[in-house]
């Protein structure tokens, strides 16, 4: 711990992290416990489980969670661990069940997680004490958030401040049209750092940069001028202008972090498509296509990117200390029909090609970080969110000392 404290204290402000933060297994284990086991994570959307008994699994490292809709219509989350000898109860990634039965010894639980059958169990044992372990769960406008902590930080401020912009995009009435998992041979922090900056967007993402004004420095005249058409048409399109920042070093004490910001698309683009033209029916309260894109932060590693006709969700997670993954979800209006209202390949094109490019970038970054010649370098002014992420990350580690 003394070595970690020294490492944190030696870290130069607004410079990239020391190599040990990306390679040390002990630091990685601390990160898992302090950050991933204590943060709210986007697990999915309630449209995935519309009927009683519908469930899907959310897996992270050694943990598996059953997210299930009960007979009462409520959505609950249980740890996928039988209270007998620990076997996984659900083996399929999704399905519909009348009861949850462990495949090992047939211990059986109802949809509320109560143990209802355990053959040959002593009558001295009270089944009420052997319910499935709960996992903390919250719904925000249809989005399912989970937290592995027994005492999670509050998510109430996130709900209060993000409900209005989420309703604007009709989040509750969306469905997942596509889900892709991207493996990344790099430390999870390099993946999150990359997502949090657009310094690389112009040189590395020509498909994105030709349509999204975030490639500019947000303090530049070019960026300011690009915002005017988007802002001038917000009201006409049934939208409102919000700007919410309670993320990373602006996180409110005892609350999960969150943020919302909207920025413009360039002329000729009204959504995140290859040709700038609509991809799907309008969503939420939006009455016409507004030439912009909105970023949501839902905790430290879950993000949304919202256009007038679809929403893209990103969730970053570690696999090992030197590998990670990114789950990407494309969401459209719940009534939209594939092949008629939207073409799946056109829908996913931009963020599929961009994420694949990011994977290459991040892996190359990790290869350089592995070198004996790697040393920290200064962030640019255009990497302000990355600076804030690093500052927040170091504070999380300090709290473990």
Tell where the protein language model's regions lie, with residue ranges.
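Short, contiguous pre-domain boundary segments
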Residues: 5-21, 172
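Non-catalytic accessory segments flanking enzyme active sites
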Residues: 17, 21-60, 65
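Generic structural signal for secondary-structure transition and capping sites
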Residues: 36-40, 87, 200
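Short Pro/Gly-enriched beta-strand edge/turn motifs at strand-loop
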Residues: 37-49, 116-121, 295-300
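Rieske [2Fe-2S] iron-sulfur-binding domain
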Residues: 48-168
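C-terminal catalytic domain of Rieske-type non-heme iron oxygenases
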Residues: 80, 143-401
């Amino acid at each position: 711990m003394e070595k970690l404290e020294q490492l944190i204290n030696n870290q130069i402000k607004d410079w990239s992290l020391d190599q040990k933060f990306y390679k040390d297994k002990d630091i990685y284990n601390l990160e898992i416990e302090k950050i991933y086991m204590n943060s709210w994570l986007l697990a999915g959307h309630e449209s995935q489980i519309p009927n009683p008994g519908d469930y899907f699994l959310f897996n992270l490292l050694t943990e598996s969670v059953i997210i299930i809709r009960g007979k009462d219509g409520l959505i609950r989350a249980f740890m996928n661990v039988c209270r007998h000898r620990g076997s996984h109860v659900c083996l399929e990634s999704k399905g519909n069940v009348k009861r949850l039965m462990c495949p090992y010894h047939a211990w059986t639980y109802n949809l509320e997680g109560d143990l209802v059958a355990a053959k040959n169990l002593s009558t001295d044992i009270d089944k009420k004490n052997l319910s499935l372990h709960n996992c903390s769960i919250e719904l925000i406008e249809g989005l399912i958030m989970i937290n592995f902590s027994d005492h999670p930080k509050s998510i109430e401020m996130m709900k209060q401040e993000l409900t209005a912009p989420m309703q604007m995009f009709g989040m509750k009435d969306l469905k997942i049209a596509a889900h892709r998992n991207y493996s990344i041979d790099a430390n999870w922090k390099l993946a999150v750092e990359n997502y949090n900056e657009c310094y690389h967007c112009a040189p590395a993402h020509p498909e994105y940069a030709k349509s999204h004004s975030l490639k500019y420095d947000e303090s530049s005249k070019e960026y300011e001028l690009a915002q005017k058409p988007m802002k001038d048409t917000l009201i006409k399109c049934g939208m409102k202008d919000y700007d919410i920042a309670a993320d990373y070093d602006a996180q409110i004490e005892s609350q999960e972090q969150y943020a919302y910001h909207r920025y413009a698309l360039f002329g000729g683009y009204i959504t995140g498509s290859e040709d700038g033209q609509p991809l799907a029916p309008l969503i939420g309260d939006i009455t016409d296509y507004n030439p912009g894109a909105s970023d949501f932060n839902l905790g430290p590693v879950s993000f949304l990117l919202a256009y007038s006709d679809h929403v893209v969700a990103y969730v970053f997670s570690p696999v090992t200390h030197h590998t990670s993954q990114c789950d990407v979800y494309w969401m459209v209006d719940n009534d939209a029909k594939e092949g008629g209202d939207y073409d799946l390949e056109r829908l996913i094109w931009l963020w599929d090609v961009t994420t694949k490019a990011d994977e290459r970038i991040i892996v190359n970054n990790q290869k350089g970080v592995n070198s004996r010649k790697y040393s920290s370098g200064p962030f640019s002014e255009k990497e302000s969110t990355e600076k804030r992420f690093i500052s927040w990350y170091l504070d999380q580690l300090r709290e473990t000392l």
